[in-house]
């Protein structure tokens, strides 16, 4: 399994994405193991769904393999159990996909924007300016790694993200300090509860 990016590699990647007169304020990368732990519940639930589907399938085929050429109620239940099995397998793979994506992600805060850089065959950079940031949330995550969420849902979707998860820096150490730096750079007031 490939190791996470070193701080020097992260900084080099972040600096390569800067504009000519842009200053790097902070850069970092998500912790792949913390990302994996954060999504473990999905895999546990998915294994339950998968085992339920296998059990159901074994009960349906207990009297021999049914004739699937003729329509019968067991045909429908077998198809449903296969569908549930696929859902369970997909859910069990979520932590591994998140772990792989965390190893390929770099976060950067500059004097003009927040950047999320995704490495792969094609380097994808999503930039969030002051107007895109919206309400800032800070959440405590696993293993001392916190989540710093900042993108408005509209800006996240507009920049190619999913509407179910706002943009932000996930599973980073000391997200509160990064939040303070962002507020200083963009001159945003501290929110009171």
PLM region spans:
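A residue-level signal for beta-strand positions that form part of recognition/binding surfaces
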Residues: 23, 106, 147
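Conserved beta-hairpin
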Residues: 26, 89-132
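Long, distal/terminal scaffolding or interaction modules
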Residues: 20, 47-51, 127
């Amino acid at each position: 399994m490939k190791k996470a990016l070193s701080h020097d590699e992260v900084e080099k990647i972040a600096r390569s994405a800067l504009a000519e007169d842009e200053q790097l304020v902070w850069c970092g990368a998500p912790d792949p193991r913390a990302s994996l732990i954060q999504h473990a519940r999905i895999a546990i639930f998915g294994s339950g769904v998968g085992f339920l589907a296998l059990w159901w399938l074994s009960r349906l085929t207990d009297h021999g393999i049914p004739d699937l050429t003729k329509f019968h109620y067991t045909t429908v239940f077998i198809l449903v159990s296969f569908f549930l099995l696929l859902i369970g397998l997909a859910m069990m793979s979520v932590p591994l996909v998140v772990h792989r994506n965390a190893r390929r992600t770099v976060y950067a805060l500059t004097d003009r924007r927040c950047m999320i850089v995704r490495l792969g065959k094609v380097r994808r950079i999503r930039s969030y300016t002051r107007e895109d940031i919206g309400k800032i949330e800070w959440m405590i995550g696993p293993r001392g790694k916190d989540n710093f969420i900042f993108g408005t849902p509209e800006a996240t979707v507009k920049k190619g993200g999913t509407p179910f998860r706002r943009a932000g820096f996930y599973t980073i150490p000391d997200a509160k300090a990064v939040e303070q730096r962002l507020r200083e750079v963009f001159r945003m007031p501290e929110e009171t509860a």
